[in-house]
């Protein structure tokens, strides 16, 4: 893939997603970052780090940075993307079971936003057990 002609989307701008998105931007890709939190998106748009990770503080792109787009709308971002990485949380419930609701919701939003006939690559980067992608996303295809 040629960075100059490839657009990467990152769904979830937390501890994993934000540094991942910044890494792709630094490598020359156009990047669309998406988070459902308006507060997170507003903070990133201001060029500030919403994660609390001090290693990321000086890395967040300044407002107006070329090739850097941040939104709360998966539907807005995904049609622009050649590759979409889903980096949403997978917390554990009170009974110590993985909560896959974020994975399912993000997958649904991505697949609904994909234009027909597209060859977009969609990657689940969240920490999950074997079979989760087939279990949560395959029925959506």
Language-model region placement:
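Conserved N-terminal Rossmann-fold NAD(P) cofactor-binding segment
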Residues: 2-5, 30, 36-83, 89-97, ...
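Structural beta-sheet core signal
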Residues: 33, 86, 122-124
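Gly/Ala-rich phosphate-binding loop of Rossmann-like dinucleotide-binding domains
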Residues: 21, 25-26
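Residues that form or flank phosphate/diphosphate-binding pockets in enzymes
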Residues: 19, 79, 132
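Phosphate-coordination loops involved in phosphoryl transfer and adenosine-cofactor binding
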Residues: 4-7, 119
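Rossmann-like NAD(P)(H) cofactor-binding subdomain of soluble oxidoreductases
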Residues: 92-141
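Hydrophobic/small residue at the entry helix of a nucleotide-binding pocket
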Residues: 16
């Amino acid at each position: 893939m040629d960075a100059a002609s490839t657009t990467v989307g990152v769904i979830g701008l937390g501890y994993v997603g934000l540094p991942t998105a910044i890494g792709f931007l630094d490598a020359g890709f156009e990047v669309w970052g998406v988070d459902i939190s308006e507060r997170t998106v507003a903070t990133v748009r201001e060029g500030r780090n919403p994660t609390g990770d001090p290693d990321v503080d000086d890395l967040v792109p300044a407002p107006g940075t070329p090739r850097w787009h941040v939104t709360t709308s998966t539907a807005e971002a995904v049609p622009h993307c050649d590759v979409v990485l889903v980096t949403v949380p997978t917390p554990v419930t009170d009974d110590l079971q993985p909560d896959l609701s974020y994975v399912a919701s993000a997958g649904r939003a991505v697949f609904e936003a994909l234009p027909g006939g597209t060859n977009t690559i969609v990657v689940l980067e969240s920490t999950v057990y074997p079979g989760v992608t087939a279990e949560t996303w395959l029925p959506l295809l």
